[in-house]
C-alpha cells in the first residue's frame, strides 16, 4: 500500500482514496453520493457482488449474487488497513485538519474491522471444528 511507505502521497491523496472507501463501506445514510454499506446486507449477513438490490430495486432471485468470501474479506481488510495506516500518518499533528482526518481514519479502521470480522468468524469456527 502506497500510503504506508509514502506519507506525502498519503496526505495528498487522502480525500481521493476516501471516495473509494466510501463507495464500499459508507456508514452514513445522510451521504448523498454513496449508498450505505453498498455490498453488505447486515440482516442476512452476506455481501452481495453487485450491491444489495438489482437496478430495478428488486432482490436477486435465489440469492445468486452472493460475493465470494475471499473477495469480501480482502476488500474489507483493505479498508481496515487503510484506516490504520492513515491514523498513523495523521497522528501526533496539532493541525486541525490532520486531527479531523485522524478521527476519520480511526473510524475507517473500525468499519473495516467490523466488515472483515463478519465473514471471517464463521470461517475460523468451521476450520477448527474437527468432529467430521
Where are these regions (language model features)?
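Long, well-ordered core segments of solenoidal/helical folds
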Residues: 13-57, 94-97, 114-131
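Active-site capping/gating regions of soluble enzymes
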Residues: 63, 74, 80, 84-85, ...
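Core of folded catalytic or high-affinity ligand/protein-binding domains
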Residues: 1, 33-40, 45, 63-67, ...
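Short, glycine/acidic-rich beta->alpha junctions
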Residues: 16, 60, 74
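Short, solvent-exposed segments of well-ordered alpha helices
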Residues: 11, 59-69, 110
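Soluble or luminal CAZymes and related metallo-dependent hydrolases
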Residues: 16, 71, 111
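Well-ordered alpha-helical scaffold segments within catalytic/enzyme domains
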Residues: 1-8, 63, 71-89, 96-104
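Hydrophobic transmembrane alpha-helix bundles
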Residues: 52-53, 58, 65, 76-80
Amino acid at each position: 500500500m502506497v500510503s504506508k511507505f509514502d506519507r506525502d502521497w498519503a496526505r495528498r491523496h487522502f480525500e481521493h482514496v476516501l471516495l473509494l472507501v466510501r463507495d464500499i463501506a459508507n456508514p452514513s445514510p445522510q451521504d448523498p453520493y454513496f449508498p450505505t454499506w453498498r455490498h453488505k446486507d447486515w440482516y442476512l449477513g452476506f455481501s452481495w457482488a453487485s450491491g444489495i438490490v438489482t437496478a430495478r430495486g428488486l432482490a436477486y432471485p435465489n440469492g445468486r449474487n452472493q460475493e465470494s468470501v475471499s473477495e469480501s474479506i480482502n476488500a474489507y481488510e483493505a479498508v481496515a488497513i487503510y484506516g490504520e495506516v492513515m491514523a498513523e500518518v495523521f497522528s501526533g499533528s496539532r493541525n486541525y485538519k490532520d486531527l479531523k482526518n485522524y478521527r476519520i481514519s480511526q473510524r475507517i479502521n473500525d468499519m473495516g474491522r467490523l466488515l472483515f470480522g463478519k465473514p471471517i468468524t464463521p470461517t475460523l469456527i468451521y476450520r477448527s471444528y474437527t468432529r467430521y
